[in-house]
Amino acid sequence: MQIPEPLALISHALRYEKSEAVFRTGDPADAVYRVLAGEVHLLRRAPDGADIVIHRARTGDFFAEASLFSPRYHCDAICVRPCRCLRLPAGALRQAIANEPSFAMEWITALSRNLRRQRSAQERLALKGTRARVVHYLVDCGESGCVTLDQPLIRWAEELGVSHEALYRALSAMEKEGVLARDGTTLRLLARSNGI
């Protein structure tokens, strides 16, 4: 996405360390961010104090766009590894959307893509069983059932909503059955059946 020049001139690339907050719940919502490198999780707190990951922003993704018209952020944005993020001031971003039709269309396209990805993740989490979630991920997020993971298996398990032990067992069983091939971080679905 090409950022219009007036917005680009006042946007800044910022560096963050692993576990550093980009913003916290209740902070003034004065910017939207784009991940240039790394990964940022948007977190809310459950009543028991546990973190709930509501969004995973990876390289190229925007985050905090839901707060573009809000006075305050509704979640914490925490870097899960060292990150570089582009900070787009909210007022200037709103102005660019209003005044630059081609940018507005690109913005809407990016929001639509993100919404589809979030809906797909919700669909995946509604599936019963680890195998079903793995297959859904490979078919939905990969090309011809092949995905090269950009995260450790333990983090992928969190994204799938399963324990890492359950994920390891499912992957091992699928390999033994000839349903899945693994080569380092690349997973390829070899066959599909009603039993998956």
Explain the meaning of each model-derived region:
Residues 8-9, 27-29:
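Short, small/polar residue-rich loop motifs at catalytic or cofactor-binding pockets
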Residues 1-20, 57, 62-63, 67-70:
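Cyclic nucleotide-binding regulatory module and flanking cytosolic helices
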Residues 53-109, 116:
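Cyclic-nucleotide recognition modules
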Residues 130, 137-196:
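Phosphate-/nucleic-acid-contacting segments
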Residues 21-27:
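Short phosphate-coordinating micro-motif centered on Lys-Gly-acidic
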